[in-house]
Amino acid sequence: MGHVAVLASSNENKLSELRHALDGWTIELLGADDYPPETGATYYENARAKAEFGRARAGDRWALGEDSGVEIDGLDGGPGVLSARWAAGREAERALEELEGVEGDGRRARYVCELVAITPDGTEHRGTGTLGGRIADTMSGAEGFGFDPVFIPDGEDRTVAQLGNDWKRDNSHRARAARALLVSIMQS
């Protein structure tokens, strides 16, 4: 089942991951410069606002909205929905700075992603994905973006940036959200 969709984002990395996860779909970046501000209290609210923004410009295509972040136990679940604005391109470095001296469970973390798809007729589908793990003591690895150089997934001993983009495309919170989105679509 393939659909033609616009992703209400300017993030090429997210586009690449979603093209892989939503195999058979044709997805393009909306590429607008005037996205609505992320003012939602939840990932869903932000993803839905982006999808609605995209829908107004998508014509007869589906509109995809995505919001994601990392929740770190030692930061009381932060930065959470504020992840994109929390460190302005220095996510991994800031996480290490904020967690200096924090050990054990305080370094537990989870990536969270919410995807919302709105069809041309206005039907909404959504999928949520999470990836549990912990924040490393130092940055390692060259692939990925954001928190990937410091995020070690459960069951692994290397960061997402070390595991690489191929691993991430199949196992990330975004890939899991895409699979959940496909289930939602198939069940409707």
Predicted regions and their residues:
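Anionic-ligand binding patches
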Residues: 2-6, 12-188
